[in-house]
Amino acid sequence: GHYNKYNKIEMEIFRNGELIGYNYYFFERNGEETIITNQFKFSVDLLGTTIFQVESYGEEKYIKDQLISFNSKTLQNDKEKFVNLELNKKTRKYDIKGSSFNGEATTNNVIGNWWNHKILQAGSQISPISGSIKEQVVTFIGKEKIDLYGKIYDVDHFTLKSKDMNIPKDKRLDFDIWYDQKNLRILKVSYSRMGNWAVSYTHLTLPTSPHV
């Protein structure tokens, strides 16, 4: 898979230009099995009081390139959300038990995590927080250059939106995504919801580097 190159991807989360959290992906390999662990945490403060806080831990398991399980737990303020997904070997579909969805999903769905550029090729994604299935439309906007932490990248700019834009705004997909095609990785994601948010790639640890 395209993720065989990485040991760790680090991203930072900004709101209105202020750093408020992190989003890390860790990659472990054992033969044909790859386990990708995701940890993210952010909090929004207003006048010294935390008004919104999210902390999440998730684990995706692949055999070769096939997702076989995904489990996550998320604390949003004091509300617990979860996903337990398994590939059903008989039906060849995903069985999902989630905080906002219980049922089946086809294997064309991608877990909505930013390490995986296949999210740009999928017709629908599974929420990594609640397990809900969201149909999406990805549109190529154009080729651009972006500056991240003083480094210039050549990127393809896409929008990723819900197929049905009439669903409530807090459930809707509406992202701008900047993608480094040469290295098959998403470098930046932005969206607006209670402010302007951005998730930016900061650092990549490769298996060959000495400090792993």
Please place each PLM-identified region on the residue numbering.
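Acidic/charged, solvent-exposed loop-and-adjacent secondary-structure segments enriched in E/D, K/R, S/T
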Residues: 94-109
